[in-house]
C-alpha cells in the first residue's frame, strides 16, 4: 500500500508495521490459501460490523 493511503486511514506506526508483516506472509500463500484467508477476514469484518451496530443500538449514551 502506498503511504498516502495509510495516512488517509489513520493507521498507527504499529499498525503499518503489522500490515507489512501480514503482506509478507500473504505473499507466501498459494491462491487457495489466499482465498480462504480473504473469506475468513471478510467474516470477521462482518462480525465486527454486527458488534458495532449492537453497541450503537443498545448502549445508553447520555
Curated annotation (Swiss-Prot):
Localization in the cell: Plastid, Chloroplast
Keywords on record: Chloroplast, Plastid
Alphabetical list of Pfam families matching this protein: NblA (PF04485)
One GO term describing the cellular component: chloroplast
UniProt-listed InterPro entries: NblA, NblA_sf
Miscellaneous remark of the record: Although originally identified as Cyanidium caldarium, these sequences derive from Galdieria sulphuraria.
Family to which this protein belongs: Belongs to the ycf18/nblA family.
Entry protein name: Uncharacterized protein ycf18
Organism: Galdieria sulphuraria
